[in-house]
């Protein structure tokens, strides 16, 4: 976490610089010197407020997660509470819209996933994000499916989101948001058909 006193204007500037440098040279080569140069600040500012590269990466991921949470929450607030399929689509859309689909954001996500396997604090952030996604999905899915079915489908959708993200990040053309939504909605439609047939 950044220390208190960091000017608010500097935080987004440094977060954007971090993602830009990771996009350009990768996580391991993204040095404090390169990031500070990109942001137009001294290395001392980064070291003072963030304690170095690790702290800056953590703050960058927190910002990406905040943006994701805000996008999904805003979309859900615009929909009726009983519009469950639309709300599921809103949760899916939030993971592939605008900011989240930018190349530099997706590459930072990929670096974060890799880093979090060996870092307790980043792993905790990843777990919080994962649990939030599953929780959002289960609230809606349990209104359509039996609890055990909803649990399986929620994890299926989450796995598709992660897998499409990974493939899109590794693709030079980036993430195809329309195709991502089509794939996941096709899966959801098939689950609806499958479990409806079982009830008949």
UniProtKB/Swiss-Prot annotation:
Pathway: Amine and polyamine biosynthesis; betaine biosynthesis via choline pathway [regulation]. Pfam families: TetR_C_6, TetR_N. Keywords: DNA-binding, Repressor, Transcription, Transcription regulation. Coiled coil: none annotated. Residues 8-68 form the HTH tetR-type domain. Repressor involved in the biosynthesis of the osmoprotectant glycine betaine. It represses transcription of the choline transporter BetT and the genes of BetAB involved in the synthesis of glycine betaine. GO terms for molecular function: DNA-binding transcription factor activity; transcription cis-regulatory region binding. The keyword Repeat does not apply. PROSITE patterns: HTH_TETR_1, HTH_TETR_2. The keyword DNA-binding applies. This is HTH-type transcriptional regulator BetI. InterPro entries: BetI_C, DNA-bd_HTH_TetR-type_CS, Homeodomain-like_sf, HTH-type_TetR-like_transc_reg, HTH_TetR, Tet_transcr_reg_TetR-rel_C_sf, Tscrpt_rep_BetI. Residues 31-50 bind DNA. GO terms for biological process: glycine betaine biosynthetic process from choline; negative regulation of DNA-templated transcription. The gene is betI.
